[in-house]
A protein has these predicted regions:
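Conserved catalytic-core motifs of eukaryotic protein kinase domains, centered on the activation segment
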Residues: 1-5, 64-67, 168, 195
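Conserved hydrolase catalytic core segment
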Residues: 22-66
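A catalytic-pocket lid/entrance helix-loop region that shapes and gates access to the active site
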Residues: 58-85
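Alpha/beta-hydrolase
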Residues: 88-153
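Conserved loop-alpha-helix segment in the C-terminal half of the alpha/beta-hydrolase fold
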Residues: 150-188
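Catalytic histidine-centered segment of alpha/beta-hydrolase-like enzymes
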Residues: 188-198
Length: 211
């Protein structure tokens, strides 16, 4: 399965296998960025798979320009001298996620980097993930309107209002086609960390009201 330039078929298969193996039925799915796209595709194909869907700064349309930027960064391996350097690197590349406390940056650093054989640190993700993305010159806008229109479960959209991935115009158009709850985070871009107490409390409150 391919959504424009993003290949998500393996993620869909893995998720369905995971649900079946652990006998998970009608969970609430909270997906950030690509995780949100996977959730939307699942909800559109399997009408009763989720009790509710929470989309963290992702929607029915993504402009190509920020995807080119993300793809270019993800393909690079940056080596960092120590954890302090790693923390400063994360503060630079994740400046828009809205983290306020140093303790949260420490936590993010702990789980975002791994040590290398040379004693340095690098980002803890599989660089092969970029193989599913097109070259910058061929990158297209990602259009998920047909997927979005088929979703039937309850939806909360979390919008980092400084985001280039989920723009105000996209949110407006999404509202024209479907009813959903919207949580706007003014100080964040792509994508809100959901680590600040006010963010956590909002999501918890929404879940309690919808249970």
């Amino acid at each position: 399965m391919k959504i424009n330039s993003i290949k998500i078929g393996p993620y869909i298969k893995d998720t369905l296998f995971f649900f079946k193996r652990l006998n998970i039925k009608k969970p609430i799915w909270l997906g950030t960025s690509m995780g949100g796209i996977i959730g939307m595709v699942l909800a559109s194909k399997y009408k009763n798979i989720f009790k509710a869907l929470i989309l963290n700064d992702i929607g029915a349309f993504i402009d190509a320009a920020p995807l080119i930027k993300i793809g270019g960064y993800a393909k690079k391996t940056v080596l960092l001298d120590d954890l302090a350097s790693a923390k400063e690197h994360l503060k630079l590349i994740y400046a828009q996620i809205g983290i306020k406390d140093e303790e949260d940056w420490d936590y993010l650093t702990k789980y975002s980097v791994i040590s290398t054989f040379g004693g340095k640190y690098k980002m803890n993700y599989d660089p092969a993930i970029t193989k599913g993305m097109k070259n910058a010159s061929n990158q297209e806008d990602v259009k998920l309107w047909s997927v979005w229109n088929k979703i039937k479960c309850r939806i909360l959209v979390i919008h980092g209002m400084k985001s280039q991935i989920l723009t105000k115009s996209t949110v407006k158009k999404m509202k024209e086609t479907k009813t959903f709850d919207l949580y706007e985070i003014k100080y964040a871009g792509h994508a809100p960390s959901l680590m600040n107490p006010e963010e956590i409390n909002y999501v918890k409150s929404w879940l309690e009201k919808k249970s």
